[in-house]
Structures are given as C-alpha cells and as structure tokens.
C-alpha cells in the first residue's frame, strides 16, 4: 500500500461518529432541491476562507506542507458551510481549526499503522496570536508514544528498528 497516496487525503471522518441512516431521518415535507445545493456549492468554490486562520492563529511548527494545505482547505470548507457570508468570530475559527486538525490527525494515525516510523512523530498544534499559547490537538484513537507497545505481543509478532546507511532510524 502506497502511503503517499493516503497522505494526499485531507481529512478522515471515522464512520463510528456518524449515525447510521434510518427511515426517521427522511422527511415527507419540503426539502432542498439538489440542483440549488449543487449550484451553491459550485459558486462557493470560487471563494476561499483559508486566510481566516491567519487572522487569529498560527499553525504549529510540526505540520508539514501537506498537513498545512489539508488543514487550511478543511477550515475554508467548514467556514463556507457554517458562515457563508464571511462573518465569523475567533471562536468559530477555533472550532473549525480544531476539527480540521483532528480530521487530518486521523489520516496521520492511519498512515502510522501503514508506514511505521516515517509518520511516528506527529504533533499537531496551533498558536493563539494574542496570547501566544500553543494548543495541541489529539484524537481518541491516537496510538501510543512508544515505538514498541507495552505488554506481551501475540505469538509471531516481531518488532525491528534499525539504522539505515543515511543514519536515519527506521
């Protein structure tokens, strides 16, 4: 499995956080015609709210370029849905930023399972421009901080860490 392909995903929403579709979710009243929704979405693609983060926060130093792009685009998309008129508060941006970082962090957690040490050291954070306080974002299914998990492994499990000729551990 190519980890570079999965690293291109901006966000990962776990299915267990979304309720299963049930008949009571459907309506017998008027609802939104998808043509209008599709046209609205097409028009909103022309606008970008990516700079909303910079007004209030700065992204942490541990995010690589793919992470920064993914978080900015996810925040922009969430703000377009929640505040299409462009008027949002610092708290609105914080909520969207935290959610975007959690969604991107989930991508990294899956990559950690596939790619091992390459994606091991992932610390997502953002810094408040006013207070300069740094906030770290984690997810419930986040893996441990140890290379080899504690406890007795299942029979046949082997952990191997070596140093390459380049000096990189992997």
Describe each PLM feature range:
Residues 1-170:
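C-terminal regulatory/interaction module of P-loop NTP-utilizing enzymes
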């Amino acid at each position: 499995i190519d980890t570079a392909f999965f690293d291109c995903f901006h966000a990962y929403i776990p299915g267990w956080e979304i309720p299963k579709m049930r008949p009571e979710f459907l309506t017998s009243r008027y609802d939104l015609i998808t043509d209008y929704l599709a046209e609205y979405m097409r028009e909103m693609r022309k606008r970008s709210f990516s700079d909303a983060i910079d007004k209030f926060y700065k992204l942490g130093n541990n995010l690589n370029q793919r992470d920064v792009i993914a978080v900015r685009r996810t925040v922009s998309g969430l703000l377009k849905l929640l505040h299409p008129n462009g008027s949002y508060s610092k708290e609105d941006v914080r909520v969207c930023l935290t959610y975007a970082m959690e969604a991107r962090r989930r991508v990294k957690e899956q990559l950690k399972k596939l790619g091992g040490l390459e994606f091991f050291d992932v610390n997502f954070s953002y810094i408040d421009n006013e207070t300069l306080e740094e906030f770290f974002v984690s997810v419930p299914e986040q893996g441990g901080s140890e290379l080899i998990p504690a406890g007795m492994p299942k029979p046949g499990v082997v952990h191997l860490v070596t140093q390459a000729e380049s000096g990189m551990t992997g």
